[in-house]
Each structure stands twice: as structure tokens, then as C-alpha cells.
Amino acid sequence: MLSAFQLENNRLTRLEVEESQPLVNAVWIDLVEPDDDERLRVQSELGQSLATRPELEDIEASARFFEDDDGLHIHSFFFFEDAEDHAGNSTVAFTIRDGRLFTLRERELPAFRLYRMRARSQSMVDGNAYELLLDLFETKIEQLADEIENIYSDLEQLSRVIMEGHQGDEYDEALSTLAELEDIGWKVRLCLMDTQRALNFLVRKARLPGGQLEQAREILRDIESLLPHNESLFQKVNFLMQAAMGFINIEQNRIIKIFSVVSVVFLPPTLVASSYGMNFEFMPELKWSFGYPGAIIFMILAGLAPYLYFKRKNWL
């Protein structure tokens, strides 16, 4: 899908992108999973080559941040959650050339959707491609900050469940949720660090106008403030995981202790019953009129004796 936007009084407005409408007036070309015809149109009308899927997947810095005859290129991660609430990072290719911003991505992303909604009612300050790029990065950082806050909130709820829970199913569910939150936190951190690298490259290589240079530095400061919070999330997750595993081990030990005590308590009565169950010819107790009730009483006493002993030693 191809979308194009132009500036009118420093405010983004969408261009109709039918075949008859040229793209030359667009300041922002946004492509989501473009087909061959859309790629060819951008190439023929604007002379811009677009990144391929293998190029989007490259992770080395030289393939993600570079400048060539086709413009300034930045490939950056954007965080998303799909319909099934599975988190991930999707690479977006940014290219700035001749005062125009090209964005190429493989899916719809929350940061882009939020920025387009804001752009309907907010005017840009300088109205250039660099400001567009930095505004998108700024929206991304806001989204990541919200995600960190959501993880904090979820961890607080899990902390109460783990510290107050007394059922094994609660701990199992808590461990599963903790693993999921740790995965989300790792993806958020990866996105923050990747954005930090992209902005550092932009500050070093691009001749940013004064307003955009300060904007880039402000976003970098925001990232620096978020990274320690993100790191503390991992510490909290690890603590809660260890606490949950500790409580699970305590519960398992309690169950094992119960079975051990039961087996020890029933071992002496079993020995008594086995003794009187032997078929020898000379067993005087067999002829006693109180032999059977006496054996039953003996078995009960044999079971009570170790139980009372364990109680006295506070082993139960």
C-alpha cells in the first residue's frame, strides 16, 4: 500500500495516489508491503530505489545506517503487538533524499498510526523531512515509555499474586506471565538501543537544521532516561521468578514431607501386620482369644509412636 503526504501551511495532508496524481509534491512517501507496481511507480516518478526484504533484515550497522547516492538511509526497529498480543520488532527503512522522506515497512505499526492521527490537528515547526523522521522517532519513544509503564503495572500485580498466592496453579500462571513480560522488556530494550544508534548516526552524518538537531538530542536524552528503567524491569522479573520458584520448591517439599511422614508412620503397622500374616505352624498368638484385637491395637500404637515423636521434634 502506498500513501503520500504533502505540506500545506506546515500541516501534513494526504495526497490522492491514483495513477493520474503525480507524487512529485509529496514530502512523505509511506509504503506498507508495496507490490511491484508501487515500487516501479516510486522509481519512475521520483527516481528512488527501495530497500528489499533481505536488506531490511540485515543487522550490522553498516547495512542499517549509511549514506549513498540514493540519500541518507536509516533502518530502525519499531515495536508492535499483533492481534494475539504477541510482541515483536519490525524494521522500517527510512530514506531522506531531496527534501523528501521515504518510509518502507512490512506491516502497520502503532507509532505510525498515532503520528498520522496527531498530524491531522498539529502543525509542524519547520516542515522538513528531518522533522518528519524525528517526529516518528519521538512517537516511537513515547510508545516504548508507555510499554515500560504497562510492564511495571503488570509486575506489581504479579508481585502480589506471588507473595500472597498459595496454589500451585497461580505460580505456574505467574511464571508464564513473567517469561512473557521479560520477552517484551527485551524487545523494548532492543528497540531503544537501536533508536539510540540511529539518532547518533543522524546527528553525526546529517546536516540537521538547528531545530532538528536539538530535537534529536532531546530524544536521545529521553532514551537515556528510559534505559535504566528498562534495566530495572529485568531485575524485578528475575527477583519475582526466583521468589516464585522458591515458593514452588517450598510447596513441593511440603508435599514430599507429608508423603515421607505417611510412609514412616505406616511402616511399623505394616511390619506388625506382615509378622502376623506369616503362616508358621508355631504362632502362639493365633490361639489367643484377644490375639486379633491385640494385634490391631499394637499396629495403632506402632503408628502413633513415630507420629508423636515427629510432633515433639517439630518435624511436622
Curated annotation (Swiss-Prot):
One of its GO terms (cellular component) is plasma membrane. This is Magnesium transport protein CorA. It comes from Escherichia coli (strain K12). The gene is corA. The keyword Manganese applies. The record marks 253 as: Essential for ion permeation. Homopentamer. In the absence of Mg(2+), interactions between subunits are weakened, and dimers, trimers and tetramers can be observed in vitro. CDD domains: EcCorA-like_1. Coiled coil: none annotated. Residues 274-287 are periplasmic. Keywords: Cell inner membrane, Cell membrane, Cobalt, Ion transport, Magnesium, Manganese, Membrane, Transmembrane, Transmembrane helix, Transport. GO terms for molecular function: cobalt ion transmembrane transporter activity; magnesium ion transmembrane transporter activity; nickel cation transmembrane transporter activity. It is a multi-pass membrane protein. The central ion permeation pathway is formed by the first transmembrane domain from each of the five subunits. Mg(2+) binding strengthens interactions between subunits and leads to the formation of a symmetrical homopentamer surrounding a closed ion permeation pathway. Co(2+) binding also induces a conformation change. Low Mg(2+) concentrations trigger both a conformation change within each subunit and a loosening of the interactions between subunits. This results in an open ion conduction pathway. In addition, this results in a less symmetrical shape of the whole complex. GO terms for biological process: cobalt ion transport; magnesium ion transport; nickel cation transmembrane transport. It catalyses: Mg(2+)(in) = Mg(2+)(out); Co(2+)(in) = Co(2+)(out); Mn(2+)(in) = Mn(2+)(out). A motif (Probable selectivity filter) lies at residues 277-279. Residues 1-254, 311-316 are cytoplasmic. Belongs to the CorA metal ion transporter (MIT) (TC 1.A.35) family. It is found in: Cell inner membrane. Its main location: membrane.
